[in-house]
């Protein structure tokens, strides 16, 4: 027993029912009843007609019991070592008291400043003395074009 589908509504057509329309270009349309055929001939969009299968699919009608809601995977946190720091070092820094951390930071900043100062001083001593300021180059004056005269009076 062959069960067909309606070209307009999408409902099943059982043997002995329905009507087949063949167009001049050779396209076959099988309709469940005259209601479907008339709607097709009036060029009604089956996605906008509420009782068709296409409409029900478009607006997700009657699918709640069939499909369970998809479960999303929760992200999990892992603690692992980074290149240049072992996990124990990271945990020790994390568990450090804020006062100790602040003192360490200030000490590191002080050290960096001293190092910068020493490198700057060494550069100063090795740099050759300059013979005074070089004369600045004279810039060429820009030639500005005069605006074209306005024509046509007030706008």
UniProtKB/Swiss-Prot annotation:
InterPro entries for this protein: L24e/L24_sf (IPR038630), Ribosomal_eL24 (IPR056366), Ribosomal_eL24-rel_N (IPR000988), TRASH_dom (IPR011017)
Q: Where is the composition biased (Low complexity)?
A: 124-133
Composition bias, Basic and acidic residues:
96-117
Membrane-spanning regions, if any?
none
Keyword Ribosomal protein on this protein?
yes
Which keywords, in A-to-Z order, does the entry hold?
A: Ribonucleoprotein, Ribosomal protein
A GO molecular function assigned to this protein is: structural constituent of ribosome
Which residue ranges are recorded for the region named Disordered?
92-155
Q: Name one GO biological process term.
A: cytoplasmic translation
UniProt GO cellular component terms: cytosolic large ribosomal subunit
Paired cysteines (S-S): none
Entry keyword Amino-acid biosynthesis = no
Name the PANTHER family on file: 60S RIBOSOMAL PROTEIN L24, RIBOSOMAL PROTEIN L24
Q: Which family does it belong to?
A: Belongs to the eukaryotic ribosomal protein eL24 family.
Specify the protein name.
Large ribosomal subunit protein eL24
What gene is this protein translated from? RpL24
